[in-house]
């Protein structure tokens, strides 16, 4: 069987697809981007958040391409299980696929026993492989974002990422990804630290916001690359912080036995996260604190009670970016995403007042299915251009 997975987490899915794969299952990460929004809007309403239109467009275009045997193909989509509209994508995707003239299973990846009969089977072996994929991809993303803007030989960072992706996918597929994670962390950091860099002084921008827009280049019109080409270094926090936020905010309301299991899982994940952070810092790279001190640091500055969608994690990442010296933060969200408008927009002015001594500037960038790339870049320039001007003047950035 072939399982099609939509673009969502650029770095994470490159490794996570090895966790889903088996001898009988081939996993294909959809990367088609041309015309996907228009194709998606044929089958979903434009009032829906744009990640849904992109996912539907990717799937329909892939099925129309003829590259996949529709008799032996399925589509996999994650569900958070809260009141975010993303939890309702699956019935919309099924309806769209049927309307497009195809009949393939649409599977759900969730931890709430939703979609019984069409739920991806989550096993302990899969979880261990997935943990390895998440931690390695976080490490590679953090390293790449801190080195690529300064590399002396263009393309060297991306090439090293491809080399490590290939090695790590093989380890994860075999189930040995976590066995040698300590030595792998060291080898990866050492390899990236050896890349020759310039000594330029560049502005530093943080990305926060809704999961899809923050991590998916198709969703955010390759905004990270655009910023790098304009002379900025972009910092994006790792996905493992979201995983721990999700456990902390969504999975503690079960029976005592299940809750205890999730707490153990949380401690294991954060233990690996701490080791990754120590290794990064040992080789001179920067990273947020592990989840527990990361959360503790922000509790006096933002409310940590809103847990729908990306919830309080958005504000927490803004605060941590500001406290780490980042002077500009781009807040990315789909237009009409209520959880992000409440937890994001609703906190921006308060955060800027509370952190006025840091000089951090926030700019909200909304993505809409009918919006143009030019409008997105113009909005993003409201944050970047003043920072570049100040940088040329020699002011602290």
Sequence positions of predicted segments:
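An N-terminal assembly and electron-transfer interface module characteristic of large anaerobic redox
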Residues: 1-397
């Amino acid at each position: 069987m072939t399982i099609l997975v939509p673009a969502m987490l650029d770095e994470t899915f490159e490794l996570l697809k090895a966790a889903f794969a088996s001898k009988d299952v081939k996993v294909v990460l959809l990367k088609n981007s041309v015309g996907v929004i228009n194709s998606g809007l044929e089958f979903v309403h434009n009032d829906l958040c744009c990640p849904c239109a992109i996912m539907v467009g990717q799937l329909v275009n892939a099925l129309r391409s003829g590259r996949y045997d529709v008799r032996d193909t399925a589509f996999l989509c994650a569900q958070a299980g809260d009141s975010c509209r993303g939890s309702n994508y699956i019935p919309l995707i099924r309806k769209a696929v049927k309307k497009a003239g195809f009949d393939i299973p649409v599977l759900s990846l969730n931890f709430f026993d939703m979609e019984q009969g069409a739920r991806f089977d989550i096993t302990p072996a899969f979880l261990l492989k997935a943990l390895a994929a998440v931690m390695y991809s976080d490490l590679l993303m953090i390293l790449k974002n801190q080195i690529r803007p300064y590399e002396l030989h263009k393309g060297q960072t991306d090439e090293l990422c491809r080399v490590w992706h290939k090695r790590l996918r093989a380890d994860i597929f075999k189930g040995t990804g976590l066995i040698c994670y300590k030595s792998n962390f060291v080898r990866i950091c050492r390899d990236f630290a050896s890349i020759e860099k310039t000594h330029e002084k560049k502005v530093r921008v943080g990305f926060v916001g809704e999961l899809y827009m923050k991590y998916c280049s198709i969703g955010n019109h390759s905004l990270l690359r655009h910023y790098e080409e304009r002379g900025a270094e972009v910092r994006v926090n790792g996905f493992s912080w979201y995983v721990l936020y999700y456990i902390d905010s969504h999975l503690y309301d079960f029976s005592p036995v299940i809750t205890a299991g999730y707490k153990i899982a949380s401690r294991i994940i954060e233990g690996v996260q701490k080791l990754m952070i120590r290794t990064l810092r040992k080789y001179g790279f920067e990273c947020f604190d592990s989840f527990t001190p990361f959360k503790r640091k922000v509790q006096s500055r933002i409310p940590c009670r809103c847990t729908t969608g990306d919830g309080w994690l958005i504000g927490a990442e803004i605060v941590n970016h500001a406290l780490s010296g980042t002077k500009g933060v781009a807040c990315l969200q789909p237009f009409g995403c209520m959880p992000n408008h409440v937890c994001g927009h609703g906190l921006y002015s308060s955060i800027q007042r509370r952190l006025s001594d840091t000089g951090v500037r926030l700019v909200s960038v909304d993505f809409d299915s009918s919006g143009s790339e030019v409008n997105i870049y113009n909005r993003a320039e409201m944050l970047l251009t003043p920072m570049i001007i100040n940088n040329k003047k020699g002011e602290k950035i």
